[in-house]
Amino acid sequence: MVNKPSLAKRIGYHESGHAIMAYLLHHPIEEIKVFVNKYSHYGYIITDPNLDGRPVSRCIKEGALISCAGNAAVYLLTGRKYWWRSSGDYVDVVGALSWLYGCKDEITAYIEFLWIQAKNLLSEPENWCAVEYLAGCIEGAQQEPGYWDEGEYYVHYDYEDTLQMDGFEVERIISREIEKYFSHEEGLSN
């Protein structure tokens, strides 16, 4: 069954999919930004991976996995597959492709493989709970009065763990909360 969540919910899950995958791959998250106006929306995350000593092949795979994770999270939420060849999420497709070189059919097959791998990683219960938690924070920020009015608004999680929205600042402890969440889960399993 296909679920049709609100745009705010899809945005939240999409960006949190990227962010949690980055966290799982040990790429520190510097910021998560969601930009919305009356006609369009987009979001992005910026990570600061410490790639020293990592093999190039691992860096390539991790970068492409993070790019695939946004659509994978939305799929897990909605049950709808966003095909890479026709996805409206063009930037993520380009992001994943930018890490890869080779013939078109091989790249398409590899991206499909990474998409499945991202979906499987995010669907693990503790990871999915973290996606839901962060998505709720992002979605909640979009519910602020005026957020969907005409004009340009954005949600911005920066390294200082502050949420800024159209001039308002609300404290949110995002990366710390994610880490606290995973520490709590590890404590429960011990």
Question: What are the language-model segments listed below?
Answer:
Residues 2-190:
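Soluble catalytic regions of large protease machineries
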